[in-house]
């Protein structure tokens, strides 16, 4: 994981607010599962970005917690006058293999293409999902809930490699 900053309680408040701003219209509206796809795809990419040890995704994930903490500190202080709190318990999703990294790359391309085709509102939801995924997955609780994700990516990459190399086909 390429994240030097732990999420603070005020950073969590910002992530929770962004999550609620994206979830509430769906809850109050039709509750169609397909309406969650923009936020969910962004969240998934943000979550896997925390597993990246470098590159653009790793850098963006590393910056997200710091941005959330800074914005949360200012927001909470402006609204309540109270000072911020210490860092929350850190979590780690695990490691990517080279095969898993290929799956993350393909996933990034897919989300980027969806971003290019999306309308303004869906782009906001995708960005919010990415931010929430990158910030919440550095906490111990969310990382524990999603600890299956890197293994799934690595396995999918290994299966892709085996299929391309001809192992186990027919």
Where are these regions (language model features)?
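Hydrophobic alpha-helical membrane-insertion segments
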Residues: 41-62, 131-147
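N-terminal signal-anchor/start-transfer transmembrane helix
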Residues: 8-29
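Structural signature of hydrophobic alpha-helical transmembrane segments
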Residues: 1-14, 92-104
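Hydrophobic alpha-helical transmembrane segments
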Residues: 81-108, 167-170
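Alpha-helical transmembrane segments of multi-pass integral membrane proteins
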Residues: 139-170
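Interfacial/capping segments of alpha-helical transmembrane domains
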Residues: 56-75, 145-156
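Alpha-helical transmembrane segments and their helix-start/interface "positive-inside/aromatic belt" motifs
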Residues: 24-49, 119-131
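Hydrophobic, membrane-inserted alpha-helices
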Residues: 106-114, 130-133
